[in-house]
Amino acid sequence: MKFFIDTANLEEIQEAQKLGVLDGVTTNPSLVAKIANAGSISYDDFKEHIRKICEIVDGPVSAEVISLKTDEMIVEGEELAKIHENVVIKVPITVDGIRAIKHFSNQGIKTNATLAFSPSQALLAAKAGATYVSPFVGRLDDISTDGMMLIEQIVHMFRNYAIETQVIVASVRHPGHVVESAMLGADVATIPFNVISQLVKHPLTDLGLQRFMQDAQVIQKAEKV
């Protein structure tokens, strides 16, 4: 399974990249807004920010359109695609979005169909030619719905028909989401920086390391004697 980081923060991306396990990046307007210095960011600055991300990570970088109409999505998406060959156009799963995804697919532009909350949405996006589809598991969990069940359904459907659209598990809240995604056969998990940090941690590892270090001190003292 591939690991993407879900952030627009350059420092977080650089730190995650140092681990050597990062395969790509996903961003959205909310994540970009977090890094805006004065509460807003120009569109040119946004494009420049995406370019900087592409320089850090040699892998897919999802940049989301902010328009809601098909024609406007197409214009915006084609402009974003020119930034770098690794840019993937992130499009919400709406009627207009599906039309835009179909257009991008015909033009050979990679897309990430986002805000998927049902199997039917994912299937429709795949039929339109989406490169990726992003089901949001955490947000479903928030409303007492099993988000991982959606992943299981989508993965099963896509396997039935050898659909090439890759499943990106999004809205990841904890390491359990990542592990379950891998067990279900999802292609990608896009993970916030804080959760990536949690993946490597376990209290028994900390206790074991503490014991090893104590024993190492005994060995060193014995050598001196």
Curated annotation (Swiss-Prot):
Matching Gene3D superfamilies: Aldolase class I
Print the keywords alphabetically. Cytoplasm, Pentose shunt, Schiff base, Transferase
Name its cellular compartments. Cytoplasm
Q: Which PROSITE patterns match?
A: TRANSALDOLASE_1, TRANSALDOLASE_2
Q: Which family does it belong to?
A: Belongs to the transaldolase family. Type 3B subfamily.
Q: Which GO terms describe its molecular function?
A: aldehyde-lyase activity; transaldolase activity
Q: Which terms in the GO cellular component ontology are assigned?
A: cytoplasm
* Enzyme Commission numbers on file: 2.2.1.2
InterPro entries in the cross-refs: Aldolase_TIM (IPR013785), TAL/FSA (IPR001585), Transaldolase_3B (IPR022999), Transaldolase_3B/F6P_aldolase (IPR004731), Transaldolase_AS (IPR018225), TSA/FSA_arc/bac (IPR033919)
A Gene Ontology BP annotation from the UniProt entry: carbohydrate metabolic process
The scientific name of the source species is Chloroherpeton thalassium (strain ATCC 35110 / GB-78)
The pathway is: Carbohydrate degradation; pentose phosphate pathway; D-glyceraldehyde 3-phosphate and beta-D-fructose 6-phosphate from D-ribose 5-phosphate and D-xylulose 5-phosphate (non-oxidative stage): step 2/3
Give the positions the UniProt entry annotates as the active site.
K90
Q: Which HAMAP family match?
A: Transaldolase_3b
Q: Mainly localized where? A: cytoplasm
Name of the protein in its database record: Probable transaldolase
Q: What does this protein do?
A: Transaldolase is important for the balance of metabolites in the pentose-phosphate pathway.
Q: Which domain of life is it from?
A: Bacteria
Name of encoding gene: tal
Catalytic activity entry: D-sedoheptulose 7-phosphate + D-glyceraldehyde 3-phosphate = D-erythrose 4-phosphate + beta-D-fructose 6-phosphate
